[in-house]
């Protein structure tokens, strides 16, 4: 089955990751997955939340948001509405959990890295793109801090689903909105699962289909890991002055 955008069922959208896109951040990356674009910025602060002080452990957290015209019709900013939606809270926590799976918080020391993931354009897979891009920003932030060894593995994420009875990788919005099953899978570079979120929208899926979807996701994440590795191969963007005033 050939999809509307010409891809095979097991094919990712074109993915690019541009590092250093936001020059004031200690680490940043603009990730594009098809038409979906997410800006991920990592900010380093000395110290940890009050409940973490004295533990010798660092902290990594994340916030997710979507620009008003990231979608085809305008959505008010949640700050204007006066409340953060449950979806936004859920995705922010998912990104944070995923990133903490790839870092040694003891090696980070009592420092905090906060990752802001802002969706510039949404065409499906925004949370998975955010995780994949946020990892790259996190690596550069750890390097900036002088603690590159705190990163112990990579992490990436991709969506899979069942559309018209067929398992598909990396769903665009038109596919996601009509899928019989929608699943988001977060994997480490060692093929470990960090999180699997899957829902049957109508017809339940069986164990055979579940295995097919997970196999697709693992292969997709392996390709994303290779893209992350290539993006991180170049020199570290200068960013703001490093601790001690040096760049």
Swiss-Prot record:
<dbReference type="Pfam" id="PF01138">
    <property type="entry name" value="RNase_PH"/>
</dbReference>
<keyword id="KW-0808">Transferase</keyword>
<comment type="function">
    <text>Phosphorolytic 3'-5' exoribonuclease that plays an important role in tRNA 3'-end maturation. Removes nucleotide residues following the 3'-CCA terminus of tRNAs; can also add nucleotides to the ends of RNA molecules by using nucleoside diphosphates as substrates, but this may not be physiologically important. Probably plays a role in initiation of 16S rRNA degradation (leading to ribosome degradation) during starvation.</text>
</comment>
<dbReference type="InterPro" id="IPR001247">
    <property type="entry name" value="ExoRNase_PH_dom1"/>
</dbReference>
<feature type="binding site">
    <location>
        <begin position="125"/>
        <end position="127"/>
    </location>
    <ligand>
        <name>phosphate</name>
    </ligand>
</feature>
<keyword id="KW-0820">tRNA-binding</keyword>
<dbReference type="GO" id="GO:0016075">
    <property type="term" value="P:rRNA catabolic process"/>
</dbReference>
<dbReference type="InterPro" id="IPR002381">
    <property type="entry name" value="RNase_PH_bac-type"/>
</dbReference>
<dbReference type="InterPro" id="IPR015847">
    <property type="entry name" value="ExoRNase_PH_dom2"/>
</dbReference>
<dbReference type="GO" id="GO:0000049">
    <property type="term" value="F:tRNA binding"/>
</dbReference>
<dbReference type="InterPro" id="IPR036345">
    <property type="entry name" value="ExoRNase_PH_dom2_sf"/>
</dbReference>
<dbReference type="Pfam" id="PF03725">
    <property type="entry name" value="RNase_PH_C"/>
</dbReference>
<dbReference type="GO" id="GO:0000175">
    <property type="term" value="F:3'-5'-RNA exonuclease activity"/>
</dbReference>
<keyword id="KW-0819">tRNA processing</keyword>
<dbReference type="InterPro" id="IPR020568">
    <property type="entry name" value="Ribosomal_Su5_D2-typ_SF"/>
</dbReference>
<dbReference type="InterPro" id="IPR027408">
    <property type="entry name" value="PNPase/RNase_PH_dom_sf"/>
</dbReference>
<protein>
    <recommendedName>
        <fullName>Ribonuclease PH</fullName>
        <ecNumber>2.7.7.56</ecNumber>
    </recommendedName>
</protein>
<comment type="similarity">
    <text>Belongs to the RNase PH family.</text>
</comment>
<dbReference type="GO" id="GO:0008033">
    <property type="term" value="P:tRNA processing"/>
</dbReference>
<keyword id="KW-0548">Nucleotidyltransferase</keyword>
<dbReference type="InterPro" id="IPR050080">
    <property type="entry name" value="RNase_PH"/>
</dbReference>
<dbReference type="GO" id="GO:0009022">
    <property type="term" value="F:tRNA nucleotidyltransferase activity"/>
</dbReference>
<dbReference type="GO" id="GO:0006364">
    <property type="term" value="P:rRNA processing"/>
</dbReference>
<comment type="subunit">
    <text>Homohexameric ring arranged as a trimer of dimers.</text>
</comment>
<keyword id="KW-0698">rRNA processing</keyword>
<keyword id="KW-0694">RNA-binding</keyword>
<feature type="binding site">
    <location>
        <position position="87"/>
    </location>
    <ligand>
        <name>phosphate</name>
    </ligand>
</feature>
């Amino acid at each position: 089955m050939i999809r509307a955008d010409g891809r095979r069922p097991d094919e990712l959208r074109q993915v690019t990751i541009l590092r250093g896109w936001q020059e004031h951040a200690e680490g940043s990356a603009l990730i594009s997955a098809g038409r979906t674009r997410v800006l991920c910025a990592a900010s380093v602060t000395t110290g940890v939340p009050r409940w973490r002080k004295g533990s010798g452990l660092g902290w990594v957290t994340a916030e997710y948001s979507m620009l008003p015209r990231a979608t085809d019709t305008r959505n008010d900013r949640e700050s204007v509405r006066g409340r953060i939606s449950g979806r936004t809270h859920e995705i922010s926590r998912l990104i944070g959990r995923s990133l903490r799976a790839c870092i040694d918080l003891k090696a980070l020391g009592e420092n905090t890295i906060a990752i802001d993931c802002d969706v510039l354009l949404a065409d499906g897979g925004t949370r998975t793109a955010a995780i994949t891009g946020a990892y790259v920003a996190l690596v550069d932030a750890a390097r900036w801090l002088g603690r590159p060894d705190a990163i112990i593995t990579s992490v990436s994420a991709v969506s899979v689903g069942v559309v018209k009875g067929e398992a598909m990788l990396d769903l665009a919005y038109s596919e996601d909105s009509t899928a019989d099953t929608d699943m988001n899978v977060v994997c480490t570079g060692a093929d470990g699962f960090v999180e699997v979120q899957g829902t049957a929208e109508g017809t339940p899926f069986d164990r055979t289909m579940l295995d097919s979807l997970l196999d697709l996701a693992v292969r997709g994440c392996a390709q994303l890991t290779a893209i992350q590795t290539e993006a991180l191969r170049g020199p570290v963007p200068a960013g703001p002055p490093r601790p001690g005033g040096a760049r």
